[in-house]
């Protein structure tokens, strides 16, 4: 019996050693791929992480946080993550819906009955339509109202007489205005302003010390400078946001804190698995076809039984969780960059390539 136990222990140790060596080889490949990609795209700086079974298995920094000052990138740098902000808002909203026993099938008017400044057509939209980008509500971006409007009133007054881009429920079309309304609904359910609610209920509670809302004009400690290509030259990329749009964009956060938040989600410290499944399931269009979004999250069914949820951010960052319910395989890949000179492929594509390398190597 003693000999058998010794043999079993040796077998387990050999198996663990092989798995660790295999992982090292995979990460060498992902690092080599990233280093080549960074070089060809002229990415200024990048932090990335890989999680398997909700545990960090690899993370690394590359390049510069500030090109003009030659400040090296470090793993604790804060990034403006743009539309990744929607993931935080989606989770916070669903927690509030659960507390108040409300539903995404309810309308804007159900949540905000006294908002007569909203057009009647807006008041009839459901929360599900707003979250899944199927509302068709006039998109402020189409009318050159970008993500730093002076006030909510300015956006509403400018758009209230504009036509819908499509009938509600008929088309998946990315829409910024919908998250202006979502912010108002979160504030109503939380009974406090959006920024304060997110700070106390999420950033403080889960010790996300780097998480702060604000555009490039706001001084935020340890934040990278973002860059873009303008006529072949590298210049600063002014990602500007104002409070009316914070539910949709405007969050700044480090890679480590983004990981911490997602681990809390996966550990069901915020929502249940059933609630996450609802958020992550693609919303069907009126035609019966799947749209491109769940409830605030990009959501796709991939080949081989895989699914993917997550979001991109300003075309310079990418957060994606991939899983296969049949094989129990899963991987989360997070790429945060501060821009590049030559985006021939974007972070979402790079993210998918890294995930493929990890899943095929397992």
Where are these regions (language model features)?
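Short linear capping/connector segments at secondary-structure termini
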Residues: 64-66, 107-115, 144-146, 216, ...
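Surface-exposed patches in mature extracellular/periplasmic domains of secreted proteins
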Residues: 45-48, 120, 142-143, 212-213, ...
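Catalytic loop of the DD-peptidase/beta-lactamase superfamily, centered on the K-T-G motif
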Residues: 20-61, 187-192, 196-200, 204, ...
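Residue-level signature of the cytosolic catalytic core of signaling kinases
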Residues: 26, 30, 77, 104, ...
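Active-site helix/loop module of the DD-peptidase/beta-lactamase fold
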Residues: 80-83, 98-138, 161, 188-226, ...
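Bacterial Sec-dependent N-terminal signal peptides
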Residues: 1-23
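Short active-site loop at a secondary-structure junction
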Residues: 41-47, 69-129, 166-177, 246-249, ...
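Catalytic-site signature segments of enzymes, centered on catalytic residues
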Residues: 141-220, 244-259
């Amino acid at each position: 019996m003693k000999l058998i136990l010794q043999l079993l222990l040796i077998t387990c140790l050999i198996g663990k050693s092989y798995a660790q060596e295999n992982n090292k080889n995979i990460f060498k490949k992902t690092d080599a791929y990233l280093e080549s990609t960074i070089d060809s795209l002229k990415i200024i700086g990048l932090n990335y992480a890989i999680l398997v079974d909700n545990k960090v298995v690899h993370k690394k920094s590359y390049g510069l946080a500030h090109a003009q000052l030659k400040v090296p990138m470090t793993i604790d740098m804060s990034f403006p993550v743009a539309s990744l902000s929607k993931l935080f808002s989606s989770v916070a909203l669903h927690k509030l819906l659960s507390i108040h026993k409300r539903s995404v099938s309810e309308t804007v008017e159900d949540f905000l009955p006294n908002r007569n400044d909203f057009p009647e057509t807006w008041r009839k939209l459901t929360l599900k339509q707003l979250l899944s980008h199927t509302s068709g509500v006039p998109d402020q971006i189409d009318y050159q109202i970008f993500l730093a409007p002076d006030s909510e009133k300015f956006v509403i007054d400018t758009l209230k007489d504009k036509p819908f881009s499509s009938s509600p429920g008929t088309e998946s079309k990315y829409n910024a205005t919908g998250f202006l309304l979502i912010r108002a609904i979160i504030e109503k359910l939380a009974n406090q302003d959006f920024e304060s609610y997110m700070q106390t209920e999420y950033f403080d509670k889960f010790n996300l010390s780097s998480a702060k809302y604000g555009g490039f004009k706001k001084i935020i400690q340890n934040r990278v400078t973002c860059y873009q290509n303008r006529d072949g030259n590298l210049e600063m990329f002014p990602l500007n946001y104002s409070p009316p749009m914070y539910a949709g964009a405007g969050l700044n956060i480090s890679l480590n804190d983004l990981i911490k938040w997602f681990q809390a989600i996966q550990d069901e410290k915020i929502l249940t698995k059933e609630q996450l499944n609802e958020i992550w399931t693609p919303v069907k269009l009126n035609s019966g076809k799947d749209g491109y979004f769940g409830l605030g999250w990009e959501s796709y069914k991939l080949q081989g039984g895989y699914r993917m949820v997550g979001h991109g951010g300003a075309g310079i960052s990418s957060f994606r969780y991939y899983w296969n319910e049949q094989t129990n395989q899963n991987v989360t890949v997070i790429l945060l960059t501060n821009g590049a000179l030559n985006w021939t492929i974007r972070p979402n594509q790079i993210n998918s390539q890294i995930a493929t390398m990890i899943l095929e190597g397992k």
